Amino acid sequence: MSKLLGLFMKKLYKALIEVLYFIYRPVFYVLVVVDTTILGILTIALSFFDPTGNTVHYIGVFWSRLNLFLSGVRVRVHGKENIKKNQPYIVMMNHQSYYDVWAVIGYIPLQLRWVMKMELRKVPIFGLGCE
């Protein structure tokens, strides 16, 4: 009987998690759109007053960590101590999801500069931001 009860509890727990995820997922997307919009506007405004890019970088770190937190993802970085200051690096992301961008911006101690295909400059609004 206790085995049957344990199986029932596992199924009940799984169903509850699925319902909670179904409810939270659209909330998460709305939160990401809202925080990205607010922080994006703040970043654009402050970028005119910060030629070093430090402020923009720290807003990006905050944005990335906030979105990872909201999504429930924990990031663990191994080998961060091997990154030397004042040395250039090439960091490539495969964009399997947006999480790789958030993880790299939020947890790798580098100020990134982005490289993209020329064709992406033709995308409305996005391309304008790359000028």
What positions do the PLM features span?
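Catalytic core of membrane glycerolipid acyltransferases/transacylases, capturing the structured
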Residues: 39-62, 68-71, 78, 85-131
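N-terminal membrane-anchoring alpha-helices
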Residues: 2-74
